[in-house]
Structure formats: structure tokens, C-alpha cells
Amino acid sequence: MKIGLIVSRVDEASIGIWSMLKGMVKFKEINTNEYSSDLALALVSDKDIVYVDEADEWARVNDIDLLLFLSRHEMKNPKPLITFHTPGNWTNDVELGGKPGQVAISEPRVLTNLFREAYRRIGELNGYSVTLEATHHGPFVDKPVVFVEIGSTSNEWRDPKAQEFLASLVFDLLNNTDKYINDGKDAAVSIGDLHYTTLVNHIINGEYDVGHMVPKYIKPTPTIIKMAVERNTVRPRIGIIHWKSLDAESRVMSEKELSNLGLTVIKRR
């Protein structure tokens, strides 16, 4: 698997993780913005991470199989947090980059196994917790993508221990790709969950890997359901509907669409 790293110079967490990773992997500078090594390529941009649209063309030209965006995380009620997610916009709102109504390709196995590995190690990072987020924000990339993030204030973004923690996870992925890819688990999509998943115990217990997650604040449509299922590296077999979060119409539609697409439906009540 050919992996590409996307770094933003204006993102304190991003450039910090990148600096730590360069201490673990011998990268050669190709030009001002590009680096290569035996384990990965890297693109370093002056843009904020959600607006690095050139990552799409760069990944295509370099035949990249998986992109990892190294990023900061922000939230309304800040707390120390390590988080992972797929980028994309379910609606036409592109305030945070990307394209209207388009999502990147999710890599359920890598996304979920990075989370599992971080969850296993999080005791090393005093005061932090770890989670998976719903699919949100840009940029749009027509390649498998995982965002790896440090949250949620400049104190954490600049925290060398948090930067080293994520750099070590990325280093483990680069050196042990098979561990993250060949786990033999079914993939799932999630409809109607909170922005920060409530499926942690099911995921940690290995019941399934999770790709795209459509949060409760997005009203699902047949188009959204189809994108959530089809924009994955592996075909999901499980569709999880968070029953109480959806109105009656959305429940019926989501169950019907997931079933028609061949998924086994789990209703979380």
C-alpha cells in the first residue's frame, strides 16, 4: 500500500506531528513541498488542512492508495482529544472546504484500527481521550482518506507528547500495514449517531469496522445513504440505524435503502 501524508504549515498540530514523524522516518526532500521515503510520500502545504484541494491531484499523479491528513481538532467544549474520521460534506455547505454533497472514500479498516490502537495506548497520554467522528469537512479527495487529529486547543496542538503519540501511530501503520488492513471484520456504516460515535464498545470489541458515519444533525436521504455505502474501500455488510435519533420518515427510508443495497440492518434503540 502506497501511503501519502498531507501536512499543513499553518496547523500547529499538523506540523508538530510531521516534525516528530521525520525523527522516526528518513524522508528525502524532493522540493519545498514534497518529501519521499521508503514508507510514504508527503505533501506539505501553506493552506489550512481542510482546504488542501491539491491533495487530490497529487495523490492521483503519485498513485497513492491511502492519504493520511495530519490535523488539529476543534470543538465547542474543548477537551484533550485524539480523534479520527473520514472527510466529506453530506450537504452543500462548504464553509470548511470540500465539494458540495460529496464525500471522500472511507477506509473502514485503517480508520477503525487506528482508533483501536490509539484506544489501547491512550493511557500513555495523560488526560486525553480518543474517539471516532462522523464524516465532515473538506477537502474532497477521490481517494481513501483518514484524518488523524489532536484536539482541542492550542495547548494540545502544541503538546509534544500528543504529537509524538500520533506520529508513533502513523509510524506503526507505515511499518505494519497488514495489521491495519487484514483484520477480517465486516465493515459497517452508521446513520443517525452523535457526531462523536456512541459505538465505541462495539468497535473495541471487534464486532465490525466502521466507515462513513452520517450524524444525527444530517437528515438522511437515499442519495446520502447510497454515498455512505458505496464510497468505501470495502463494501459494508452492516447498516447501523440509531433509531431514536431519526424521525419516523427517516427511519423507514434508511432501513429500506440499506436493505435494498444488500446490508444487514441493525436498529440501535
Swiss-Prot record:
Give the enzyme's EC designation. 3.1.1.96
Task: Tell me how the cofactor is bound.
Answer: Binds 2 Zn(2+) ions per subunit.
Show the Pfam families listed in the entry: tRNA_deacylase
Gene Ontology biological process terms in this record: D-amino acid catabolic process
Superkingdom, according to UniProt? Archaea
A GO MF annotation of the entry reads: zinc ion binding
Q: Which cofactor does it need?
A: Zn(2+)
Alphabetical UniProt keywords? Hydrolase, Metal-binding, Zinc
Q: Which reaction(s) are listed as its catalytic activity?
A: a D-aminoacyl-tRNA + H2O = a tRNA + a D-alpha-amino acid + H(+); glycyl-tRNA(Ala) + H2O = tRNA(Ala) + glycine + H(+)
Reported function: D-aminoacyl-tRNA deacylase with broad substrate specificity. By recycling D-aminoacyl-tRNA to D-amino acids and free tRNA molecules, this enzyme counteracts the toxicity associated with the formation of D-aminoacyl-tRNA entities in vivo.
- Assembly notes: Monomer.
Instruction: Name the family the entry cites.
Output: Belongs to the DtdA deacylase family.
Write down the PANTHER family for this protein, in alphabetical order: D-AMINOACYL-TRNA DEACYLASE
Check the record and name the HAMAP family matching this protein: Deacylase_DtdA
Designated name of the protein = D-aminoacyl-tRNA deacylase
